[in-house]
Amino acid sequence: MQARRIARELALMSIGQMPADRSRLQAKNLEELVLASVRTLREEANESLQRACTELRQGHNRLEASELTAPTVEAARREVAAAIALAEQAINRVGASLELPEFVRLADELQVRAYAFELLGAFVREGDNLDKLLDTCMEGWQVERLTRIDRDILRLALVEMVELKSVPFRVAIDEAVELAKKYSTDTAVRFINGVLRRVVQHLQLEQRPRR
């Protein structure tokens, strides 16, 4: 996993925990938000594994029940199919859970947290201006009407594209799309991609020479 990708996810989780009035947030507050996000990830890993165990037990129980209580062959097949679906769901959940410990370990690394702090600091300073830019570039929408997760993904992308200029705008868009795939909906993926491309056109980023 790339350090900056993990930092973006930490920053995204931290923004969601910020108070509406960001003016009094200090570096210490930002650090506490990031640490709270890491703790949340640990808890999610444990809960996901527990749910996987529960689903496996449920699948096993349905298989046993199908042998004893199913009145017809067709009913037995349905029970077996349901048991297999539960098992597959559990396996997928375990696979996702196994990635989280590595994610959490890397999230504790200095360079990851440093970039997360940098993203959050820029957002605290320039968040209002970024929201105005989004309002200008969204067709028929306002920032306040967006779901929180979609709004924060867009804000983070603008922090990297406009404020920090820490990655090429194409990378910022691609990373925002990946965050949307993980944390939001298919519709949001297309929406976020479209909004950020309108930002690029509005700021004429494609016409600027690459550094």
Curated annotation (Swiss-Prot):
GO terms for biological process: DNA-templated transcription termination; transcription antitermination. Keywords: RNA-binding, Transcription, Transcription antitermination, Transcription regulation. The keyword RNA-binding applies. One of its GO terms (cellular component) is cytosol. InterPro entries: NusB-like_sf, NusB_fam, NusB_RsmB_TIM44. HAMAP family: NusB (MF_00073). This is Transcription antitermination protein NusB. It comes from Gloeobacter violaceus (strain ATCC 29082 / PCC 7421). The gene is nusB.
